[in-house]
Amino acid sequence: MALRNTVDFLLYDWLKVDQLNQRVRFADHSRETFDAALDTCERIARDKYAPFNRTVDTQEPAFDGEKVILPACTQDAHDAYVQSGMLSAAQDYDIGGMQLPYTVEAAANAFFACASVSIGGGMLTVGNANLLMKHGSALQQEVFALNEFNGRFAGTMCLSEPQAGSSLSDVATRATPDGDDHASDPFGPRYRLKGNKMWISTGDHELTENIIHLVLAKIPGADGKTIAGTKGISLFIVPKKLVSPQGQLTGERNDVALAGLNHKLGWRGTVNTLLNFGEGKYPVRGATGAVGYLVGEAGKGLQCMFHMMNEARIGVGLAATMLGMAGYYASLDYAKTRTQGRPVGPAGKDPSQPPVRLIEHADIKRMLLAQKAYGEGALALGLYCASLVDELHTGDEAQQHQAQWLLEVLTPIVKSWPSEWCLEGNSLAIQIHGGYGYTRDFPVEQYWRDQRLNMIHEGTHGIQAMDLLGRKVLLEDGRGLKLLGERMQTTISLALDHSHRERSDAIHLQAHALALRQAVQNITEATQAAWAGGEPAVALANAVPYMQAFGHTVIAWVWLQVAMSSQGEGDANLGRRQACQFFFHYELPKISAWLNVVKSRDSTCADMPEAAF
C-alpha cells in the first residue's frame, strides 16, 4: 500500500489529475474510473508479476535453434496485462481504448515496473503502435497498430547494429525496392532489407501471434551509394510473419532470423536479441531479403522513430524510478526488523543493552532518506512529465505549446536522472542489508543489476547530456529553458508566500525557495558560460556534470512543490517534508562542484592524451 498511497497523493493531491475530466476527451472519467484502473494494475502486478521476479531472473530466455523458450509465468503475466486493456489504455474508444489520461496510464504501469521490471515488454509494443498512429498509412494503422493495441501482435524498435550502437548515422542495413510493382503494395512502398540489428528487446518470442519490427535502414541511390549521416535513414515495418491486407497471417515466414540471445547482467526476463534481416534463412517467394514497408517519407525515418524514442525515454525513467522504489521498500522493511548494534548515548555505547533495529541508527536513516528522496522525487517528475503529455494532446493552443517546450528540456532529465540516482539508491539498499544484500537471498542485488541498464539503453547517459546542453536548452534562443525557469520562479514565489502563512515548516520552505532561486541562477549562468566561446567541443566536454546539476535543480523544484502540498498532519506528510529537506540539505549543494567545471569550460578530460591513461 505504500506505493499506492504515494501514487494517490501525487495524482490527486498534487497534480489534481481528477480535474482532467473537465476536458472533452476525459469527460466520461472520474476518480472512480481512475482508481479502478489503478486497482486492476496493482492487483495484476501483485499476483502475476511480483511472485515471479526472481524466476525470470534465474530462468533466462533460451533459444533451442528454432524458437525462444520462456518460463510459463511470462506468458501468464503477458496475457493478464493484455486482458487488463493497458496496451490501449490511452487510445480512442472506437479502436478499443479507454481514453485514460497518459498520467493515469503511467501511474498504473508503475505497479508493474515495481513488481518485476523485466517480465513484460508492453512499453515497446505501445510505443511502436503509437508511432504508426502518427506516421503510418491508414492500412498500416488498421492492420499493424490496432493489432498491437489489442495484444495480438507485439512490437519492437530496431535501431542499433553490432558496429553502430548509438551512432545511428553509421547503420549498414540496406533497403532496396522489391520488384517493379513495389510502389503499389497496399501497405506502402515495399522493400527488401538486408542487415543485422543488435540489442533488440523482445526481438523474438512466442508470446504473441506475430512481432512487428520497426527497422531503420538506408535506401541506396541509383549509383548504389547512400546519403551520409542520418538524413538518409528511412523507417520500415518488417513483420516476423507476413500479413495480408485483411490482417490475417499468410502462412509465410519473413526473412528475419534470430541469430542469438544476449545474456545480460540484469533485466533478464526480457528477451534481448541479435536479428539478421535478409540472410536467406527464410526466403520469401524464393528470394532473400526481409520484406518491409516504408513508413512515412524516405529519408525521414529518424524523425519518425524519435516519436517512439521519446516515449521510450519517459518509460525508461519510470522503470528506473520503480526499481529505486522497490529497493527502498525492501531495505526499509529490512531496517525495521533487523537488529544490529547499540545506540550511542551520552557515555558512548552500553554493551549491556540489547541491540536495536537498524532503523534506529542515524546513518541508516540517512540512506533510507536518500532512497526516498531519489525515488519519490523521480516518480513525481515522471508523473509531471506524463501530465505534460496530456496537456500536449488535450490542452488549448497555449498549453500545448508550453507543454511541448517543457518536454523538450525535461525528457533528457526524466530519462537520465532516475537512471543515475535510483541506481545510487539501489546501491544504498544493498548497503543497508550489509553482507546479506550482496547475496541472492534478498532481492536488492537484483534491483541493482536490473537498474544498471537504464543509463545505457534508449540513449546513453552521455548522449542525453549532449542532447540537453547541445540542443534542448538552445532551441529557439532557449525558449524551453526560459519557460522552465519561469515555472520554477512561480513555485519559488508561492513557497515564499506559503512560508508566511503556514505555522509549521515556514523557515524551511523559505530557505528551500531561496536555495532553489540560487540554483536556477547558477544553471542559467553555467549555460551561458559553456557556450561563451561558441565551440561545441569545448561546451559539451562537461555536458554530464551540467546535466547532473540541471537534474538536481529540477528535482529540487519538484520536491518544493510536493512539500507545499504536504503541509497537513500525519506521518506521510511529515515524511515528504523531511525528504524535501534532505534533498535541499544533502543533495542540492552538490551542483556547485558540477557547475564549476562547466562555467570554467574545464578541459581536464578533453585534454587528457590517450597515452597517459
Predicted regions and their residues:
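C-terminal helix-coil-helix/basic helical segment that borders enzyme active sites and/or dimer interfaces
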Residues: 376-414, 527-541, 562-571
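Alpha-helix capping/hinge segments and adjacent helical runs
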Residues: 192, 267, 384, 405-483, ...
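Internal maturation/activation junctions in enzymes
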Residues: 61, 124-125, 136-189, 196, ...
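Conserved phosphate/anionic-ligand binding catalytic regions in large, soluble enzymes, centered on
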Residues: 90-101, 117-120, 317-324, 420-439, ...
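A glycine-rich, basic-preceded beta-loop-alpha segment at the flavin cofactor/substrate interface
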Residues: 242-259, 264, 271-312, 332-359, ...
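C-terminal amphipathic alpha-helical interaction region
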Residues: 475, 491-613
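A short core secondary-structure module
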Residues: 189-253
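Amphipathic, small/basic residue-rich leader segments at the start of a protein or domain
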Residues: 1-119, 139, 143, 603-613
